[in-house]
Amino acid sequence: VIKFIGNIYERLRKSPKRIVFPEGTEPRVQRAAARYVKLGLGTPVLLGDREEIESVAKREGVNLDHVGVIDPAHAEDLDLFCERLETLKRYRDLGPLGAKKLMIKPNYFGAMMVQYGHADGIVTGAGEEAANTLRPLLQLISPQPHLKSVSSCTALDLSNKRYGERGVMFFADCAVIPDPTVDQLADIAVETGVLYRTLTGMKPRIAMLSFTTHSNGSLAGPAKVAAATALARQRASQRGIEMEIDGEMQADTALLPELGAKKAPQSLVAGR
């Protein structure tokens, strides 16, 4: 755990980031922001009512020195963000009052901060339902030009270093697209691989999971995964991204060397 997270810490210390936390009154979020400062990783910004944030911090014994606090309802950028919101087709009919009512919600305000460079990133979802946190992010933050779909991934750093790359594995997509198409699945694979390399510096080995291993397209579900595997390889090659992609395969085949060698002996991914 120390090495994977420690490497990210070192990169942040060399290039500190301004991170916005919309759930500014949550004690757990406040402690995370305070630790972000203590570790020298950048500048955290809590969103919410200033008095309530300070009251919670005092009650919980959280030191908010060098932690920014912005109340969206009284922020200098509120009018600017409302104007920008009304330029978006989805929100064009809101009117000034409707735009303001939406923009004072911390997740919307935080998403707009990221979209227009007022923050480098956003950390949210500690206490709210996923839909309430994802909606403003997906609607207000523009994806990179080459992306057709936006997805999520979960990073695991296991104490058992037998699995993954010394215990480090990424799983996608676990939150945003419940039933991806072939096209979306290929995007998810490649972009997760890119993120993996960015955060670890290691070559990605991507297993496209299903309930069969190399079944030759006899079933619809595995056939979709196999087609996505081929498309993901093509897209990675076109962009000059070096990564190993194989599928479809079962999870145990991907993770366990003895099963990988038995079920997919030619694979550079199975069992690894």
Residue ranges and their predicted role:
Residues 1-227, 231-271:
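Anion-binding alpha/beta catalytic cores of soluble intermediary-metabolism enzymes, centered on
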